[in-house]
């Protein structure tokens, strides 16, 4: 009987440890679904986890401001919590292509991209083939001014130069056009990239793959 009681206690202890381990994740998901104090949850579209290997690193509190909403840009809302990421999903080996979400961005002076691209410190007109990558894929500027190949689901492809980081850790300020932090799986392409792929810019988002050129 004593042995059975000991085994039962061990099983109960293990069960309690398991519950304690998963509670923080459950709480985070609850907040992402729209919970949290003040009625403001995580921005739903940005709260979806793109990869189980890349979890949120934190959150920032939204502040609204002078946000250029061109190209379907999402503008920060006061008091809303936005998740941040220090990583991106793993890059596929062998140049097979890494799944990503293509978004639309103007890198021109006065466009919705905010300040000048960080790789070169200069702006690019909408006819140039340039992109920004989520923080993890930007990889500490290692892809600055390097080419990537972007492929649409329909088979079209284009080569574009990386000129900026789509910042997954900061946002909701003037440097980021008062937009939320970038999701962890974004290739932010100029209008020229969308045109070269034959995509409808009004859609604002498209499933693509990308690889280093």
Swiss-Prot record:
Cell location: Secreted
Signal peptide location: 1-32
GO cellular component, one term: extracellular region
One Pfam family recorded for the sequence: KWL1
Matches recorded under InterPro entries: Kiwellin-like, RlpA-like_sf
Keywords carried by this UniProt record: Secreted, Signal
Disulfides per UniProt: none
Signal is among the record's keywords: yes
Name this protein carries in UniProt: Ripening-related protein 3
Protein source organism: Oryza sativa subsp. japonica (Rice)
